[in-house]
Amino acid sequence: KTIGMLLAAGIVGLSTAVLSAVSVGGRVPSPRTAGSVNAGLDLMPDIVSGLNLLAGEKYETLPSANGIGVWNGEEVVPMDTEDYIIHVTAAEMPATYEKEALKAQAVAARTFAMKHLTGELRCKSGHTICTDYACCQAFLTTEQLRERWGSSFENYYARIEAAVHETEGLVLTSGGELVTALYHSSSGGRTENCEAVFAVALPYLVSVESGGEEDSPEFTSEKCYTTAEFISKVNSAFPDAQMSDPAKDVDVWQRTESGRIQLIRLGGTVVTGQQLRNALKLRSTNVKFSITQSNVKITCFGFGHGVGMSQCGANAMAKNGSSFDEILQHYYTGVDIERFEVDSGELCLLPEQTNE
């Protein structure tokens, strides 16, 4: 999947609203009150244009901070922010996942939405946020969910609604600032450093182990080609490759800490792992080749860019008894879980945090 949005690594300071930020400190402040359309938000454009820092742009006030305007491709639909998070969570994570995993997903999705509301993340449509998973976050309407879930609709919707309500207003911060809460379907066993994918280092997006994913259908996938098919696809995507013999013309030059291909020689050209993934429509850049005289088999580990929270890993942690805050603090290193409070229709980060 590709993304046309611009990611921001810095937080915008807003000065005119009230955020009651309560650090978790080992526990979460009490809240006030199955099948996804895609395999996790995969924020992966290409290695060059994936991350754009919006340094210096300030958005001081936010009208209608209790809600969010969602562009559906035809019009902007005003929604309550928490209702929006329900529909995003339903689209981004299977409803059959463990409740604590669904809660972790809701917090990540809410953080991502708040980054859009503050103007730190930009939608390529020019609107605040859209329903295109390749740009912002996946989104399914109630009617689409009924069609997808059939007779399980009431049960599945209630599960996701509860996960969102039980984490109402909670977001992820680092140093008092909203984080860029990237997530993906499956890491293949270990997540990736942000700089290895997006060329920007973020202290909370670092490589961590992600155990328990082996039983997920997203953990591995295979693509098999005849030698002629593989040569044709490679030479079509990369004319300078001029490949003739895959056994001699495929050479992995560099892998990341988690095993993902960073650079690979294909005949007479060298490309990035992401360029290879795009060209062959692979699920990830963590791949291994098995080449014979007649065939080329590519085994992929994981699904997605591998940065941030692995949804399959989150579900595995939840099955093993981890709470949603433990899941989030595992995948987003050193973050705090805080609550947004809106006053006078405006939103900001309160400079001072209070511990509870």
Label for each model-derived stretch:
Residues 75-79, 96-107, 224-228, 304-308, ...:
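Soluble non-cytosolic domains of exported or imported proteins
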Residues 11-23:
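Hydrophobic alpha-helical membrane-insertion segments, chiefly the h-region
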Residues 111-296, 301-302:
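Extended substrate/cofactor- or partner-recognition/assembly subdomains adjacent to catalytic sites
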Residues 272-356:
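C-terminal soluble interaction/assembly domains
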Residues 90-94, 107-119, 169, 235-239, ...:
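Sec-exported extracytoplasmic/periplasmic mature domains
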Residues 67, 79-98, 206-218:
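Acidic/histidine-rich, surface-exposed loop or edge segments in extracytoplasmic proteins
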Residues 24-71:
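N-terminal, intrinsically disordered, polar/charged segments of Gram-positive cell-envelope systems
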Residues 1-11:
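N-terminal Sec-pathway targeting helices
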